[in-house]
């Protein structure tokens, strides 16, 4: 696997020099300063590429080129946004960056309720609390119809949870959910947030699939002409939330996506932490079945909690519910399969969402993206990969 690291650009508190010391050789990056929907010019791409390469690193993957909300709903100026997206892909490919991660999650990117969940060892992790999220939906946002998404027991627990919250806690929970986590390009007020949700009224899972298929059908000719691979990131968490459909959550979703848009340029990001939240997702089976379409991997683990099967926190990379041993083995099998047919390019892998720990506890960091926790995760995965290669792979 190619060892990569997500870098949020020149303002990231984790520098490129830090990343080199962590042992990564590839950078996962995006031009976050360019508004959603606008074309990334070659000038801006090359400027960022030069900054990365000056440190002896490679811009391996774009994460992400954001998909404008009007593309997802096929409303307003959606065709102009698609045309802009196509031009951005052309520009990236012509500048030598040929793998693009993206997602098709409506309104929100990845979602957590607690950004400082304390682990038994004193480090801090990210957490999604089903009851806290229900309290937000039912009593803070007051989304019409939200009751249908929760059991009676969950509704009662959510009311008790809300009644025990202080004003500061209400503000913090609201901010955690709607203000935008790292990598998300949009943040909202409560009123703006509800207005965005309302735009999806009448858009079912099947309808959103149609919109995604149209979007990809427009992009594939550009991707095929330039050898640029798209790698869709799964929904996080991988289930419907806020009354919104989610369409990249299960192996059945991947089956549909690859059959509907069969171009080899229509690929996948295997994010084990996202898919792994669902107990019915067999990650190794997913990799074995769709390995040829995996162009990027995020390796992390989550732990479903006993209090509620929908509640989870981010575990250490080799702990939790993800069988990292067999996941890495399956990825290495796919790399070997490719090498046997002449494709020796390694699959980019980044250690995702490390715990905030040690000296980073005293620093301001991007949630999930502190340096030391990811350094630990990368070292653990690197060691696992090396041991597996020495034991089982001789070619």
UniProtKB/Swiss-Prot annotation:
<dbReference type="GO" id="GO:0042840">
    <property type="term" value="P:D-glucuronate catabolic process"/>
</dbReference>
<keyword id="KW-0408">Iron</keyword>
<comment type="similarity">
    <text>Belongs to the mannonate dehydratase family.</text>
</comment>
<protein>
    <recommendedName>
        <fullName>Mannonate dehydratase</fullName>
        <ecNumber>4.2.1.8</ecNumber>
    </recommendedName>
</protein>
<dbReference type="GO" id="GO:0030145">
    <property type="term" value="F:manganese ion binding"/>
</dbReference>
<dbReference type="GO" id="GO:0008198">
    <property type="term" value="F:ferrous iron binding"/>
</dbReference>
<dbReference type="Pfam" id="PF03786">
    <property type="entry name" value="UxuA"/>
</dbReference>
<dbReference type="InterPro" id="IPR004628">
    <property type="entry name" value="Man_deHydtase"/>
</dbReference>
<dbReference type="GO" id="GO:0008927">
    <property type="term" value="F:mannonate dehydratase activity"/>
</dbReference>
<comment type="function">
    <text>Catalyzes the dehydration of D-mannonate.</text>
</comment>
<keyword id="KW-0456">Lyase</keyword>
<keyword id="KW-0464">Manganese</keyword>
<dbReference type="InterPro" id="IPR036237">
    <property type="entry name" value="Xyl_isomerase-like_sf"/>
</dbReference>
<comment type="pathway">
    <text>Carbohydrate metabolism; pentose and glucuronate interconversion.</text>
</comment>
């Amino acid at each position: 696997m190619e060892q990569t690291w997500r870098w949020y650009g020149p303002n990231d508190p984790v520098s490129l020099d830090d990343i080199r010391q962590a042992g990564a050789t590839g950078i996962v990056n995006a031009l976050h300063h360019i508004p959603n929907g606008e074309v990334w010019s070659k000038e801006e791409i090359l400027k960022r590429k030069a900054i990365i390469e000056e440190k002896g690193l490679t811009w391996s993957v774009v994460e992400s080129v954001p998909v404008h909300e009007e593309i997802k709903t096929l409303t307003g100026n959606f065709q102009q946004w698609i045309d802009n997206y196509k031009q951005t892909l052309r520009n990236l490919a012509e500048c030598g960056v040929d793998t693009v991660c993206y997602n098709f999650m409506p309104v929100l990117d990845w979602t957590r309720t607690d950004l400082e969940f304390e682990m038994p060892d004193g480090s801090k992790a990210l957490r999604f609390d089903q009851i806290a999220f229900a309290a937000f939906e039912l009593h803070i946002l007051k989304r019409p119809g939200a009751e249908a998404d929760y059991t009676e027991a969950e509704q009662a627990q959510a009311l008790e949870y809300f009644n025990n919250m202080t004003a500061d806690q209400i503000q913090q929970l609201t901010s955690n959910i709607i203000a935008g986590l790292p990598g998300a390009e949009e943040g909202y007020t409560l009123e703006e947030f509800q207005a965005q949700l309302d735009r999806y009224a009448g858009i079912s899972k099947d309808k959103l699939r149609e919109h995604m298929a149209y979007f990809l059908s427009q992009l594939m000719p550009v991707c095929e002409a330039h050898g640029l691979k798209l790698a869709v990131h799964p929904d996080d968490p991988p289930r419907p939330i806020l009354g919104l459909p989610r369409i990249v959550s299960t192996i059945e979703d991947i089956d549909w996506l690859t059959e509907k848009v069969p171009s080899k340029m229509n690929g996948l990001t295997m994010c084990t932490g996202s898919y792994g939240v669902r107990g019915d997702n067999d990650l190794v089976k997913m990799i074995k079945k769709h390995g040829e379409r995996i162009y990027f991997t995020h390796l992390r683990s989550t732990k479903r909690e006993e209090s509620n099967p929908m509640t989870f926190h981010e575990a250490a990379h080799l702990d939790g519910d993800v069988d990292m041993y067999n996941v890495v083995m399956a990825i290495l099998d796919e790399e070997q399969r490719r090498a046997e047919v002449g494709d020796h390019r390694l699959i980019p892998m980044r250690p995702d969402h490390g715990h905030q720990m040690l000296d980073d506890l005293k620093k301001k960091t991007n949630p999930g993206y502190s340096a030391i926790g990811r350094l630990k995760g990368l070292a653990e995965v690197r060691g696992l990969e090396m041991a597996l290669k020495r034991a089982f792979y001789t070619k």
